[in-house]
Amino acid sequence: MNTTELRQKDVDGLKAEVKELQKAHFGLRMQKATQQLTNTSTLRSTRRAIARAKTILAETIVKQGAK
């Protein structure tokens, strides 16, 4: 998901997105552990997407607290 799309979501939407990405990352880690994952770069991109979503979530919470 693009950062502009993430910035348009509210706090609940961002929390849901983080949770969904974490579930996907867990599934990928299990596939890697059982040697079913062929494209291991998806682990890195998923981990970075989680970090991106968490960063925007924190920014949104701070921005709402300042208002």
UniProtKB/Swiss-Prot annotation:
PROSITE patterns: RIBOSOMAL_L29. GO terms for cellular component: cytosolic large ribosomal subunit. GO terms for molecular function: structural constituent of ribosome. InterPro entries: Ribosomal_protein_uL29 (IPR050063), Ribosomal_uL29 (IPR001854), Ribosomal_uL29_CS (IPR018254), Ribosomal_uL29_sf (IPR036049). PANTHER family: 60S RIBOSOMAL PROTEIN L35/50S RIBOSOMAL PROTEIN L29 (PTHR10916), LARGE RIBOSOMAL SUBUNIT PROTEIN UL29C (PTHR10916:SF0). Belongs to the universal ribosomal protein uL29 family. NCBIfam families: L29 (TIGR00012). GO terms for biological process: translation. This is Large ribosomal subunit protein uL29. The gene is rpmC. CDD domains: Ribosomal_L29_HIP (cd00427). It comes from Polaromonas naphthalenivorans (strain CJ2). Keywords: Ribonucleoprotein, Ribosomal protein. The keyword Nucleotide-binding does not apply.
